[in-house]
C-alpha cells in the first residue's frame, strides 16, 4: 500500500508547494499598485555568461494609463526573460542606485520623461554614459526619453542616430498605419499594423545618415503638422522608430511610441521593442522574432498610483 500512496502523497505535496493556478478572480483581487514583486537592480549569478540589459524606468508621470514607466518596464523585463541567455535588470526613478550596473550592461534602456528634466542630462551623467557608449554598449530610448534639448541632443545623435528636438519635432496622438517594414533583425516576426499612440515624428537626424535605418514609418494626418519643419512635409512618410549602427560598433534604437500603457497588449508593438533591445545588446534575434507571450491581465500590475478616483482597469487596444 505504501508503494502506491507514496507517489500520490509526493504529488499532492508538490501541488501544495506550487500553489493553485492563477485565475481571473485572482487577477481581479490583485492590487494594481503593488510594485513589491518586481526585483530591483538584481544582478545575475556570478557564473552568468549571457547578456545583461539595464532597464531604467522614470518617475511617475501623467495620468492613469499614460506614461506608466515602471509598469511598462516591468512588462518589458518579463518579455526579455523569454529569450534564453538574457538577464534584464530593472532600476527605477530615473537612475540606478548602483551605478556600477552600467559597467556590465550590454545595453542600457531609458523609459522616462525627457527634455530639460531628463535624468540622463543631469550633472555629469552624460559623461558617465559616454564611457559606456565608448565601450560599445547598446543605447535604447523609449517614448519621451527620446526628447532632448539641442545642447544635449548633439551628443545623443552619436549614440542613437536621432532624437526629438522641441519646436522642430512634433508629438501628436494619431493612428499610425505601418504598411511596410524593412528587412532588419528588429522587424523579424513583426507584421504591418495600425496602432494609436503618441507617435512623435519629425525627428532630428544627422546630415550623414550612414548607419541609420528607419524601422517604423507611416504617413501622419497633415493636421498634426504644427512645427515649421513638419508643415513643410505634408503628405510625406515619417519615421517613428529607427535603428542606428554606430561608428564605434555599438548600436542605438529610438522608439517614439509608448505613451499608452495599453499598447503593450499589441503583439507587434511588443515584438518591435523586444527585438530592438536584443539587437542593441548584440543578441541574435530569431528569424521568427523574439518570444513575446503576454497576458493582458498584466496591464493592470505594477502601476503608479495616480489620482484619488476609483481604479479603472486598463484594457488592450480596441477593447471597451
List the model feature ranges, each with a label.
Residues 1-5:
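Positively charged n-region of N-terminal signal peptides that target proteins for export
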Residues 6-19:
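Bacterial N-terminal signal peptides
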Residues 18-26:
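Signal peptide processing junction and immediate N-terminal pro/mature segment
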Residues 25-48, 75-78, 82, 222-224, ...:
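Extracellular ligand-binding/catalytic regions of CAZymes and related secreted enzymes
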Residues 29-34, 55, 61-141, 145-148:
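Helical hinge/lid and interdomain linker segments adjacent to catalytic or ligand-binding clefts
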Residues 31-41, 165-248:
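Catalytic beta-strand/loop cores that center a nucleophilic Ser/Cys/Thr
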Residues 49, 72-76, 101, 125-129, ...:
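Stable alpha-helical elements in mature extracytoplasmic
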Residues 115-192:
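A glycine-rich, often tryptophan-bearing local segment used as a flexible ligand/cofactor-contacting loop or short
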Amino acid at each position: 500500500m505504501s508503494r502506491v500512496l507514496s507517489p500520490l502523497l509526493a504529488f499532492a505535496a508538490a501541488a501544495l508547494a506550487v500553489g493553485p493556478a492563477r485565475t481571473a478572480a485572482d487577477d481581479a483581487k490583485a492590487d494594481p499598485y503593488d510594485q513589491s514583486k518586481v526585483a530591483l537592480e538584481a544582478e545575475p549569478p556570478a557564473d552568468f555568461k549571457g547578456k545583461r540589459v539595464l532597464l531604467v524606468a522614470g518617475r511617475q508621470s501623467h495620468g492613469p494609463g499614460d506614461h506608466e514607466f515602471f509598469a511598462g518596464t516591468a512588462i518589458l523585463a518579463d518579455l526579455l526573460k523569454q529569450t534564453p541567455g538574457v538577464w534584464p535588470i530593472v532600476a527605477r526613478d530615473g537612475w540606478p542606485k548602483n551605478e556600477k550596473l552600467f559597467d556590465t550592461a550590454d545595453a542600457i534602456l531609458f523609459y522616462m520623461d525627457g527634455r530639460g528634466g531628463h535624468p540622463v542630462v543631469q550633472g555629469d551623467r552624460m559623461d558617465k554614459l559616454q564611457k559606456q557608449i565608448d565601450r560599445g554598449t547598446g543605447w535604447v530610448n523609449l517614448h519621451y526619453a527620446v526628447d532632448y534639448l539641442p545642447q544635449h541632443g548633439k551628443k545623443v545623435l552619436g549614440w542613437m542616430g536621432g532624437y526629438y528636438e522641441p519646436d522642430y519635432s512634433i508629438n501628436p496622438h494619431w493612428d499610425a498605419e505601418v504598411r511596410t517594414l524593412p528587412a532588419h533583425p528588429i522587424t523579424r516576426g513583426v507584421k504591418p499594423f495600425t496602432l494609436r499612440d503618441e507617435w512623435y515624428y519629425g525627428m532630428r537626424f544627422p546630415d550623414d545618415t550612414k548607419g541609420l535605418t528607419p524601422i517604423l514609418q507611416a504617413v501622419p494626418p497633415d493636421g498634426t503638422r504644427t512645427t515649421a519643419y513638419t508643415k513643410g512635409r505634408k503628405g510625406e512618410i515619417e519615421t517613428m522608430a529607427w535603428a542606428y549602427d554606430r561608428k564605434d560598433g555599438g548600436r542605438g534604437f529610438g522608439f517614439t511610441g509608448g505613451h499608452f500603457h495599453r499598447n503593450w497588449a499589441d503583439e507587434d508593438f511588443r515584438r518591435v521593442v523586444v527585438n530592438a533591445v536584443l539587437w542593441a545588446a548584440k543578441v541574435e534575434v530569431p528569424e521568427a522574432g523574439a518570444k513575446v507571450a503576454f497576458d493582458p491581465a498584466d496591464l493592470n500590475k505594477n502601476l503608479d498610483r495616480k489620482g484619488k478616483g476609483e481604479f479603472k482597469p486598463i484594457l488592450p487596444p480596441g477593447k471597451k
